[in-house]
Curated annotation (Swiss-Prot):
Catalytic activity: an N-acyl-D-glucosamine 6-phosphate = an N-acyl-D-mannosamine 6-phosphate
Enzyme class: isomerase
Record-given protein name: Putative N-acetylmannosamine-6-phosphate 2-epimerase 1
Record keywords: Carbohydrate metabolism, Isomerase
Functional description taken from the UniProt entry: Converts N-acetylmannosamine-6-phosphate (ManNAc-6-P) to N-acetylglucosamine-6-phosphate (GlcNAc-6-P).
Organism: Streptococcus pneumoniae (strain ATCC BAA-255 / R6)
Amino acid sequence: MSQISKEALIEQIKDGIIVSCQALPHEPLYTEAGGVIPLLVKAAEQGGAVGIRANSVRDIKEIKEVTKLPIIGIIKRDYPPQEPFITATMKEVDELAELDIEVIALDCTKRERYDGLEIQEFIRQVKEKYPNQLLMADTSIFEEGLAAVEAGIDFVGTTLSGYTSYSPKVDGPDFELIKKLCDAGVDVIAEGKIYTPEQAKQILEYGVRGIVVGGAITRPKEITERFVAGLK
């Protein structure tokens, strides 16, 4: 695991954009051979990105060969019938911990988990096993963010707002959630449906520690769809 301090990471990502570079098997940029995601990372870094969020052991290993930017790592793996799939069990945490990345992000919603644990207990177990690893909670509502902080999480992400059955469905960032968490003194990494620089600028003014932008930069299919829809 990476030994970077929380303070050092905050300084490194301050006032910048962390770019999420991912492609899942059903998406156009995914290849079995790999090699595509590191190219997105190089483009993001040349464009001024201050960090990268990435999925899977393979992609993260390839990314580390082309950049020294800090990485927020996840492993997306389905565990039906339960809904959580972002670093959903200790198995995924173990795999990520071996990669020497700055932050591991995990699903910290209140939904039923495959391992049967309450989220606070899962966080406790992760921190006990990897006490020096920085952790980010992917959450969907205010209460989940607070619960994660109380359990010892370093950063709270708004990643899953709109993606749980009980969170607001809006076509854009959950400004209200981001601001409420910041006002409560939480170290927030804003993420989710941030489509424009103007939205990112507004979010920065709330006092977030970091901002993750994904689809608006690295998913050309989604970008095209938004333009096509905008012409109708």
